[in-house]
Amino acid sequence: MAALLLRHVGRHCLRAHLNSQICLRNAVPLGTTAKEEMERFWNKNTSSKRPVSPHLTIYRWSLPMVMSICHRGTGVALSGGVSLFGLSALLLPGNFESYLMFIKSLCLGPALIHSAKFVLVFPLMYHSLNGIRHLIWDLGKGLSISQVYQSGVAVLMLAVLSSVGLAAM
């Protein structure tokens, strides 16, 4: 017990003595603060009228760029839609048939129903077909610029045609 007490007192005294020496020896006065550096950086950039890099205005929009953004967007929308559908099935009262009967009782026109079906099925078809395109790219096929544009147009046309066909069912 005495050994533990002696060890504790020795360490405590030694630590207090060394900490003051270490802190004083390594203390370096700061030349500028982070806020001053940040203000200097932004003043320099605004005075030279440089845009923040990479700036969106320097890029020319292309079909593959837009399709990549849309592929990500449809993926987020589809996963969000499936999650909302699952949560609503769990939390809302009644069953699926009662909600289907409610929609039928609204007497919506066929044009509105087909349009709604198209809006619901197009993101799924686009995301699926573009995903197949990406899988083909993963195999190392169709990576030349002309083939990328051709496959992009093909995906868009097939997505529209298949969505129209599925919405007509």
From Swiss-Prot:
Report the family membership.
Answer: Belongs to the cytochrome b560 family.
Entry binding sites for heme b: 127
What is the UniProt remark on how the cofactor binds and its stoichiometry? The heme b is bound between the two transmembrane subunits SDHC and SDHD.
Question: Where located?
Answer: Mitochondrion inner membrane
Which sequence ranges are listed under topological domain Mitochondrial matrix?
Answer: 30-62, 138-144
Q: Where is the transit peptide?
A: 1-29
User: Which Gene3D superfamilies does its entry note?
Assistant: Fumarate reductase/succinate dehydrogenase, transmembrane subunit, Single helix bin
In its keyword annotation, does this UniProt entry include Transit peptide? yes
- Pfam families in the record: Sdh_cyt (PF01127)
Which GO molecular function, any one, fits this protein according to its record? Answer: electron transfer activity
Q: Which residues lie on this side of the membrane: Mitochondrial intermembrane?
A: 93-112, 167-169
Any keyword Iron?
yes
* Gene Ontology cellular-component annotations: mitochondrial inner membrane; respiratory chain complex II (succinate dehydrogenase)
Protein's pathway:
Carbohydrate metabolism; tricarboxylic acid cycle
Cofactors named for this entry: heme b
Q: What does this protein do?
A: Membrane-anchoring subunit of succinate dehydrogenase (SDH) that is involved in complex II of the mitochondrial electron transport chain and is responsible for transferring electrons from succinate to ubiquinone (coenzyme Q). SDH also oxidizes malate to the non-canonical enol form of oxaloacetate, enol-oxaloacetate. Enol-oxaloacetate, which is a potent inhibitor of the succinate dehydrogenase activity, is further isomerized into keto-oxaloacetate.
Membrane topology of this protein: Multi-pass membrane protein
Which spans are transmembrane here?
Answer: 63-92, 113-137, 145-166
Q: How does it assemble?
A: Component of complex II composed of four subunits: the flavoprotein (FP) SDHA, iron-sulfur protein (IP) SDHB, and a cytochrome b560 composed of SDHC and SDHD.
Q: Which GO terms describe its biological process?
A: mitochondrial electron transport, succinate to ubiquinone; tricarboxylic acid cycle
Protein's UniProt name: Succinate dehydrogenase cytochrome b560 subunit, mitochondrial
Keyword list (alphabetical) reads: Electron transport, Heme, Iron, Membrane, Metal-binding, Mitochondrion, Mitochondrion inner membrane, Transit peptide, Transmembrane, Transmembrane helix, Transport, Tricarboxylic acid cycle
Q: What is its main location?
A: mitochondrion
